[in-house]
Amino acid sequence: MTARPSAPTAVDAVARALRDELDAVRTRAGGSAAPRVLDVGGGSGTWAVPLAAQGCEVTVVDSSANALAVLRSRARDAGVADRVRAVQGDVDALADIADGNGGADLVLGHGLLEYVDDPVAAVRALAGAAAPGSAVSVLVAGRWAAVLGRVVAGRVAEARRLLADPLGRWGAGDPLLRRMDTDEVRALLERDGGLVVEQVRGHRVLADLVPETPDGPSGAADLAALEELAGQTPPLRDLASRIHVVARRPGPR
């Protein structure tokens, strides 16, 4: 399903979850230090720059030099260049990049697990980069939404292959290495990452099905409320374009 910029409600829900976590970090620290965020695969700074604008110290790790150049430019334009650190590397290098003071207060792996060769190793690296008691936020492409999206578009053969494929791919030309469902993401984080899953939400459940932004003064608010509720309600949650999971590394906060 193709995302439309006119329906940002699901992104707002993810941002709210991150903001709530960072508020808790600040409360525990008594406001004495800026929260430390590690954004793995953060590319051009979609999440990093807004988080830096909220007062966080953000390290972005990405293998693309071009994406990191865009990140630096966006950070300068937003006036937060001093709070954004760009590191060229991949998830395998996290052990060398991690702070020497115990890890990050929040680790992001948004749009990461779809592309890595070894998702188990990636999740373990994300978990290891988080400080004890800190959260890991994962956003990953949903399998069932991709099936439905292709059916609606008339690409039935692709939908059948995607549904039957163990990795949720429609063929050799698929740009993603995998798509996942909520159970798969939860198992990966808990079993392989040793994390405790606290939140599972659908990201863009129904917004992409709305032909245009609803009319009227309450239209956008109604869509936002519907998306918020659907993202928490199985089985609608499981049909989301992406699955958002917040999990925590065990240990004292």
PLM feature spans:
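Conserved alpha-helix/loop element of class I SAM-dependent methyltransferases that forms part
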Residues: P8-A33
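A conserved beta-strand element that flanks and buttresses the S-adenosyl-L-methionine
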Residues: L108
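Class I SAM-dependent methyltransferase SAM/SAH-binding core
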Residues: T46, P50-A93
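A short glycine-rich, Lys/Arg-flanked "PGG" loop and its adjoining helix->strand segment in the class I
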Residues: V120-A135
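Conserved class I S-adenosyl-L-methionine
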Residues: A33-G41, A135-A164
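Conserved Class I S-adenosyl-L-methionine
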Residues: Q199-R253
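Short alpha-helix
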Residues: D174-G193, V200
